[in-house]
């Protein structure tokens, strides 16, 4: 269910502090985060976040099209290897 408009988007406070501290958008510094639930706000455009997917950190460069989405949407947690292999080859 969507979040109420009167509440505004959820962004982890530590993420906001790190983004302000890192020295501006477009800097080479990657901001490491476990907060997949944080909403991408316009101030994050140009930053690169390393979003944890449960196993490793996936680099996500934020563009204008991503505003309003969650950080976790761009770091998939499941890998799909396809369905079972062809059984004819096993005989």
From Swiss-Prot:
Which pairs of positions does the record mark as disulfide bonds?
A: none
Domain of life of the organism encoding this protein: Bacteria
Name a biological process GO annotation: ribosomal small subunit assembly
Q: Which GO terms describe its molecular function?
A: rRNA binding; structural constituent of ribosome
Q: Which Pfam families does the UniProt entry name for this protein?
A: Ribosomal_S19
Q: Does the keyword RNA-binding apply?
A: yes
- Write down any Gene Ontology CC term: small ribosomal subunit
Family to which the UniProt record says this protein belongs: Belongs to the universal ribosomal protein uS19 family.
- Physiological role: Protein S19 forms a complex with S13 that binds strongly to the 16S ribosomal RNA.
Protein's UniProt name: Small ribosomal subunit protein uS19
Q: Which organism is it from?
A: Syntrophotalea carbinolica (strain DSM 2380 / NBRC 103641 / GraBd1) (Pelobacter carbinolicus)
From the UniProt record, report the name of the gene that encodes this protein.
rpsS
């Amino acid at each position: 269910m969507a979040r109420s408009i009167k509440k505004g988007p959820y962004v982890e406070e530590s993420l906001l502090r790190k983004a302000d501290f890192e020295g501006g958008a477009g800097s080479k510094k990657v901001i490491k985060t476990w907060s997949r639930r944080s909403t991408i706000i316009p101030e994050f455009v140009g930053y690169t976040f390393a979003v944890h997917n449960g196993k490793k950190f996936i680099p996500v460069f934020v563009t204008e099209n991503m505003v309003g989405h969650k950080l976790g949407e761009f770091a998939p947690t499941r890998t799909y290897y396809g369905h079972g292999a062809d059984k004819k080859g096993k005989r």
